[in-house]
From Swiss-Prot:
Keywords: Glycosyltransferase, Phosphoprotein, Transferase
Pathway connected to this protein: Glycan biosynthesis; sucrose biosynthesis; sucrose from D-fructose 6-phosphate and UDP-alpha-D-glucose: step 1/2
Gene Ontology terms for molecular function: sucrose-phosphate synthase activity
EC number of this enzyme: 2.4.1.14
Domain of life: Eukaryota
Classification via CDD domains: GT4_sucrose_synthase, HAD_SPS
The name this protein goes by in its record: Sucrose-phosphate synthase 4
Organism the protein comes from: Arabidopsis thaliana (Mouse-ear cress)
Subunit structure: Homodimer or homotetramer.
InterPro entries: Glyco_trans_1, HAD-like_sf, SPP-like_dom, SPS, SPS_C, SPS_pln, Sucrose_synth_GT-B1
Length: 1050
């Protein structure tokens, strides 16, 4: 019955909390009644605040929640049942008895609900494992079917070994062997490479000096990592410029420096042609508001367009400086975390350059951990952390990434292994096939490499590694007259907490987060009397002014720490300063080292553990969690002990062992200093650039060119200089690539020159795309219920062209038609409705997989086809997609190939109405599990599925044209309906202006976009954007013109 006594006491505590709250509220209400209008709800909320409101919940710790969680998590249903029986047997007419019975029922219900959540989660994980195994088996069968009999035998008999690339090995006397297929980066022969590298870290507060690490959950170790990486890469021979892109923040809540567009991180070395490294701040979202990372998702397209403008500008400028006028495109685009990974994926696709990803912290791993705890439902997890949106961003990043940089092997196996887009077994098989020169049948897996983060050793003084005796008496004595050296201010701030500051210091440095497990450390220290007698504890937990003003999660951790200090009476033994500068962190490490102390990282899970490396550099032995990256760090440095973060006794034993055993302490210090070079930034950069260069060998070189635009529009001209082809050909008339033979070339050249002279000054002249000042894009998905293009497209186009003529006049605005239909379908419908396609500068067809130019005899853009073909499975996708598209068996003619719309870059499938097909997110998931990377779009009112290359889409095609023609996306106007194909959301976000025409779309395909369990539209598209306007139903050219004028287009 002891367990039931605990339950009874918890229930009584809940009743007491509820009663006291009610009494306090009633008392306050009486006071207000005397003061004024108690019937005014607004007045009550003004005086008290909303008792159930979000702000109130963030500021006040809930005892009820604590006791309920204890009951639900600590006891089973039988205990709750016994308690309920007891309550029923002893109940009476008192209100408290009835409330107790009611609480029993409610908590019993919560316990059963938790049990159901755990059960559902187990079923979900089991189903997912089966699907992943099926995907891998399908891929292996397809791959095996293409091998010859001899190759099959060899494949069956060969025992494959793990080939995960790592640069983190146990200490050896010789250098680790470099694999033969990868050459180590040598600075001697790379000095003339002039590489341009782009790093992206979107969220948090990013600046080069006085970093506010720990200010909030978004400003942590990742900020320091990316800043130091940018500096280190810029100091590497062969690297010309490094840009670190982040979000511009002009909010009064933060320092003005976060609103500066450009910040130089490092100056180029003297006598060098290098440009150095810079922080580039890109505006996105509300510029005067600090937006946490969970709310940044709708603003990613805007960041992509802004970043693209910057990169194109820098590429052009660098090309003029050092490359004879030819643009220098980024050598690699590296995204950090899920949001920046998605940005990098879009940029890499638009520019056709390699992309690298570093996850830092992974959403799926966090999601599974939260579900296992059982304290919060799946819906609440997604509502709080936007976890489904984050996971999809990570999957998209895996699709596009050439390489994924990890800190440890554990991150590969236990974290990335949870994702649809990475299967370590399939990745090994594909790598073996590539080495043998055997086709992978369009399947692809990113390469995982382990490259530990580097450290900036510039703050480490020579004496930090030379002084074996760290006695504080050499610096501070009991009398101020004994001070021999200047004392760092942070030392005084810390030592004021201690009754004896000379004792060894146990140092913990992290943000106040539940995951960092600081409370367990305080408990371990408080309950170990020998440790308390021997050492002091220093807790550096970010910066704060008032605990009440901190985020809820941080304030709860700090309050718990303060309560534990009081509970164990640790006054004079624990320091917890309110403020510290980033520049003072080295002094904090020095203080611990000079007192012969220990650094501890007791986090529940630590992805890497950069602070452990920093501590080792200052000669501090370490105690670290055994979960995650510290395992590899301790293995490499051999300078400390690993512990179970849940075991208080193990933590106190490890700390006591290192502090009390002087010989062990000295040995750990010596080993750490000896092996720390393995984590230097130069070593990190050499390994990083070696792997990037290896990955670039299989990535096509970008041939993207930018049309040169004359400074002044001195005359009218043809559409494009390519239209007057000066290339010779042995073929007659036009060849397949648009070249002319000698005779035709001469005739066209003469005609063109004559036309230019005759049309000079004529108002009806047509400017080239490179001379357009704006672009108007018609992307209305107007279909009837049968998937046929509606005739109202004609009226939409005419209204748009007329409005353009009324605002800016002919020639200044170019027109683009973007559709999910094939070229032939577009031609048929426009001819039927007497639309002149030559009014358009480009036609984007088949959901963005093809671009045609009407003014060049409808010639296809072959460069764009090459631009998007990388990772395109081609013919290999046909049989797989036909197997996967239906949710249940279908008749043979229900799902058929739509041959007239198929092309080299688009596989079109016709879907009969009423057939149950998988949604886009489900299909994409199953293709990822099989190593196939594609973009999937339902169009024509969900009667057709277009399977196109990964980097192809309508929005990416328009970004491609924007780069080629030198027209910023901010100078582009999209005309859309209120709904459309499943890529409709992609067209809403970004720097471009959007005019939504009401009532023009009949049937759409968006019901097949994603399942109810996935993220919602508000997580992908800004709900209130100044760039989106509406034109009422049946609105004509005048209404469109008025909307354009509201955008400042006149």
């Amino acid at each position: 019955m002891a367990r039931n006594d605990w339950i009874n006491s918890y229930l009584e505590a809940i009743l007491d909390v509820g009663t006291s709250k009610k009494k306090r509220f009633e008392s306050n209400s009486k006071i207000v009644q005397k003061l004024g209008d108690i019937n005014s709800k607004d007045h009550q909320e003004k005086v008290f605040g909303d008792m159930n409101g979000k702000d109130h919940q963030e500021k006040v710790f809930s005892p009820i929640k604590y006791f309920v969680e204890e009951v639900v998590n600590s006891f089973d249903e039988s205990d709750l049942y016994k308690t309920w029986i007891k309550v029923i047997a002893t109940r009476n007419t008192r209100e408290r008895s009835n409330r107790l019975e009611n609480i029993c029922w409610r908590i019993w219900h919560l316990a059963r609900k938790k049990k159901q959540i755990v059960w559902d989660d187990g079923v979900r994980l089991s189903k997912r494992r089966i699907e992943r195994e099926q995907g891998r088996n399908d891929a292996e069968e397809d791959l095996l079917s293409e091998l010859s009999e001899g190759e099959k035998d060899k494949n069956d008999g060969e025992k494959e070994k793990s080939e995960v690339v790592t640069t983190l090995e146990p200490p050896r006397d010789h250098m680790p062997r470099i694999r033969s297929e990868m050459q180590i980066w040598s600075e001697d022969d790379k000095s003339s490479r002039n590489l341009y590298i782009v790093l992206i870290s979107m969220h948090g507060l990013v600046r080069g000096e006085n970093m506010e690490l720990g200010r909030d959950s978004d400003t942590g170790g990742q900020v320091k990592y990316v800043v130091e990486l940018a500096r280190a890469l810029a100091n590497t021979e062969g690297v010309h410029r490094v840009d670190l892109l982040t979000r511009q923040i002009s909010s009064p809540e933060v320092d003005y420096s976060y609103g500066e567009p450009v910040e130089m991180l490092s100056c180029p070395p003297e006598g060098s042609d290098s440009c150095g490294s810079y922080i580039i701040r890109i505006p996105c979202g509300s510029r005067d508001k600090y937006i946490p990372k969970e709310s940044l998702w709708p603003h990613i397209p805007e960041f992509v367009d802004g970043a693209l403008n910057h990169i194109v500008s820098i590429a052009r400028s660098l090309g003029e400086q050092v490359n004879g006028g030819k643009p220098i495109w980024p050598y690699v685009i590296h995204g950090h975390y899920a949001d920046a990974g998605e940005v990098a994926a879009h940029l890499a696709g638009a520019l056709n350059v390699p992309m690298v990803l570093t996850g830092h912290s992974l959403g799926r791993n966090k999601f599974e951990q939260l579900l296992q705890q059982g304290r919060i439902t799946r819906e609440d997890i997604d509502r709080t952390y936007k976890i489904m949106r984050r996971i999809e961003a990570e999957e998209q990043s895996l699709d596009a990434a050439e390489m994924v940089v990890t800190s440890t092997r554990q991150e590969i196996d236990a974290q990335w292994g949870l994702y649809d887009g990475f299967d370590i077994k399939l990745e090994r098989k594909l790598r073996v096939r590539r080495r043998r020169g055997v086709s992978c049948l369009g399947r692809y897996m990113p390469r995982m490499v382990v490259i530990p983060p580097g450290m900036d050793f510039s703050y480490v003084l020579t004496q930090d590694s030379q002084e074996p005796d760290g006695d504080l008496k050499s610096l501070i004595g009991p009398d101020r007259n004994q001070i021999k050296k200047p004392v760092p201010p942070i030392w005084s701030e810390i030592m004021r907490f201690f009754s004896n500051p000379h004792k060894p210091t146990i140092l913990a440095l992290s943000r106040p987060d539940h995951k960092k497990n600081v409370t367990t450390l305080v408990k371990a220290f408080g309950e170990c009397q020998p440790l308390r007698e021997l050492a002091n504890l220093v807790l550096i937990l970010g910066n704060r002014d008032d605990i009440e003003e901190m985020p809820n999660s941080s304030s709860v951790v700090l309050m718990n720490v303060l309560k534990l200090i009081d509970q164990y009476d640790l006054y004079g033994q624990v320091a917890y300063p309110k403020h510290h500068k980033q520049s003072e962190v080295p002094d904090i490490y020095r203080l611990a080292a000079k007192t012969k102390g220990v650094f501890i990282n007791p986090a529940l899970v630590e992805p890497f553990g950069l602070t452990l490396i920093e501590a080792a550099a200052y000669g501090l032995p370490i105690v670290a969690t055994r979960n995650g990256g510290p395992v590899d760090i301790v293995k490499a440095l051999n300078n400390g002990l690993l512990v179970d973060p849940h075991d208080q006794q193990a933590i106190s034993d490890a700390l006591l062992k290192l502090v009390a055993n002087k010989h062990l302490w000295a040995e750990c210090r010596k080993n750490g200093l000896k092996n720390i070079h393995r984590f230097s930034w130069p070593e990190h950069c050499r390994n990083y650039l070696s792997h990037v260069e290896h990955c670039r060998n299989r990535h096509p070189t970008s041939s993207l060119d930018i049309m040169k635009v004359p400074e002044e529009l001195t005359s009218d001209s043809l559409r494009d200089v390519d239209d007057i082809s000066l290339r010779f050909s042995t073929e007659g008339d036009f060849t397949l690539n648009g070249e002319l033979d000698a005779g035709t070339r001469q005739k066209k050249l003469v005609d063109a020159i004559s036309q230019m002279n005759s049309m000079k000054g004529c108002s009806a002249a047509i400017y080239s795309p490179g001379r357009r000042q704006m672009l108007f894009v018609v992307a209305v998905d107007s279909y009837d219920d049968n998937g046929n293009i509606k005739a109202n497209l004609n009226e939409i186009i005419k209204n748009m062209i007329k409005a353009a003529d009324l605002t800016s006049g002919k020639g200044k605005i170019g027109f683009v038609l973007a559709s999910g239909s094939s070229l032939q379908e577009v031609v048929d419908i426009t001819q039927k409705n007497l639309i002149n396609l030559e009014d358009f500068d480009a036609i984007v067809c088949n959901s963005g997989s093809e671009i045609y130019y009407p003014w060049r005899d409808m010639m296809v853009d072959a460069d764009y086809e090459t631009h998007v073909e990388y990772k395109w499975p081609g013919e290999s996708i046909r049989s797989v997609i036909l197997r996967l598209i239906c949710t249940e068996p279908a008749a043979e003619d229900d799902i058929t190939e739509y041959a007239s719309s198929c092309s080299t870059r688009c596989y079109a499938i016709s879907v009969k109405q009423g057939v149950k097909t998988r949604r886009v997110d489900d299909l994409r998931q199953r293709l990822r599990m099989r190593g196939l990377r594609c973009n999937i779009v339902y169009t024509h009112a969900a009667t057709r599925l277009n399977v196109i290359p990964l980097c192809a889409s309508r929005i990416q095609a328009l970004r491609y044209l924007s780069i080629r023609w030198g027209i910023d996306m901010s100078k582009t106007v999209f005309f859309l309906g209120e709904k459309g194909d499943t890529d409709y959301e992609d067209l809403l976000g970004g720097l471009h202006k959007t005019i939504i025409l009401k009532g023009v779309v009949g049937s759409d395909s968006e019901k097949l976009l994603r399942s109810e369990e996935n993220f919602k539209r508000e997580d992908a598209v800004p709900q209130e954007s100044p760039n989106i306007s509406y034109v009422k139903e049946n609105g004509g050219s005048q209404e469109i013109m008025s909307t354009l004028e509201a955008y400042g287009i006149k």
